[in-house]
Swiss-Prot record:
SUPFAM superfamilies: Nucleotidylyl transferase (SSF52374). Belongs to the NadD family. HAMAP family: NaMN_adenylyltr. Gene3D superfamilies: HUPs (3.40.50.620). This is Probable nicotinate-nucleotide adenylyltransferase. It comes from Methylococcus capsulatus (strain ATCC 33009 / NCIMB 11132 / Bath). InterPro entries: Cyt_trans-like, NadD/NMNAT, Rossmann-like_a/b/a_fold. The gene is nadD. Catalyzes the reversible adenylation of nicotinate mononucleotide (NaMN) to nicotinic acid adenine dinucleotide (NaAD).
Length: 210
């Protein structure tokens, strides 16, 4: 079973890394792939350029074990990064191996705004990183999907290639890339929020400076 963890990673930080580790361990994934996005269709463009964001990810994962990998196909493809196209490409390579698209709760609640969002369920399971004790309000279309597809036992994800929704509580570190960029613009320290080697690269190349 393979996990797909997409994002701009602008910059990558310990919130991303800790969540990825817990997902990989809890779901017993063979591999978890970090998938840096070239251009998110529904958000402003990233601040750092694609190759710099990729370098930061490479540095952050340099000491990781074999369970993490980088998938650069969205950067290589260029243009808006539609997840349905990305998963279609991955599915052609992986055959019937179960795929898990890993998303945060906010992204999941916005799923009906994604390009061809219903098609995602024929390509992968969706694993939602849930906040403890959080009341969820769904759009009607998404509510029906959850009612039809939610499973509560993660072993069910391994039983078929795609189509299920699983909510996973992970350690929620109150770290956001937006906040880190703001701190750096204001000249404040971002130490202990992201790997030191990533922070060194940011300072060396004056990323996110005024």
């Amino acid at each position: 079973m393979i996990g797909i963890y997409g994002g701009t990673f602008d910059p990558v930080h310990y919130g991303h890394l800790r969540a990825a580790l817990e997902v990989r361990e809890d779901l017993e994934l063979r591999e978890l792939r970090f998938l840096p996005c070239h251009q998110p269709p529904h958000r402003p463009p990233p601040v750092a350029d694609p190759q710099t964001r990729l370098r930061m990810l490479e540095i952050a994962l340099a000491d990781a074990d074999g369970g993490f990998a980088l998938d650069t196909r969205e950067l290589d493809r260029g243009g808006p990064s539609y997840m349905v196209d990305t998963l279609s490409s991955i599915r052609k390579e992986t055959g019937d191996e179960p795929l898990c698209l890993i998303v945060g709760l906010d992204a999941f609640l916005a799923l009906p705004a994604w390009h061809r969002w219903r098609r995602l369920f024929s390509l992968a399971h969706i694993v939602v990183l849930q906040r403890p004790d959080y009341d969820i309000e769904y759009a009607e279309d998404l509510k029906h999907c959850v009612e039809e597809r939610q499973v509560t036992d993660p072993t069910q994800l391994a039983a078929q290639p795609d189509g299920m929704i699983y909510f996973l509580e992970v350690t929620q570190l109150a770290i956001a890339s937006t906040s880190i960029r703001r701190m750096l613009r204001e000249g404040r320290s971002a130490k202990y929020l992201l790997p030191d080697a990533v922070l060194e690269l940011i300072h060396r190349e004056s990323l996110y400076a005024k």
